[in-house]
């Protein structure tokens, strides 16, 4: 798990999921299957997706930004 900051709050994400090919494929295919995106949120945020959605205001677009921040945090960890 990695910890990262978004909108002044601390969040955790599963770094292993964020760097997994199957997960990346599911994200890219989410346009064809909307449920895939929700499964991805659940996987990345270790089941805390609804809690995190409430913490960031409940908007899907903001959850997308949170997911992007998680990817960036995983990338920063991989560089170190």
Residue ranges, per PLM feature:
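Short acidic-hydrophobic surface loop/beta-edge motif
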Residues: 1-7
């Amino acid at each position: 798990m990695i910890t990262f900051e978004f909108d002044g709050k601390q969040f955790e994400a599963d770094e292993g999921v964020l760097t997994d090919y199957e997960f990346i494929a599911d994200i890219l295919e989410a346009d064809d299957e909307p449920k895939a995106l929700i499964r991805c949120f659940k996987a990345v945020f270790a089941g805390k997706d609804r809690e995190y959605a409430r913490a960031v205001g409940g908007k899907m677009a903001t959850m997308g930004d949170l997911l992007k921040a998680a990817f960036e945090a995983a990338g920063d960890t991989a560089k170190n």
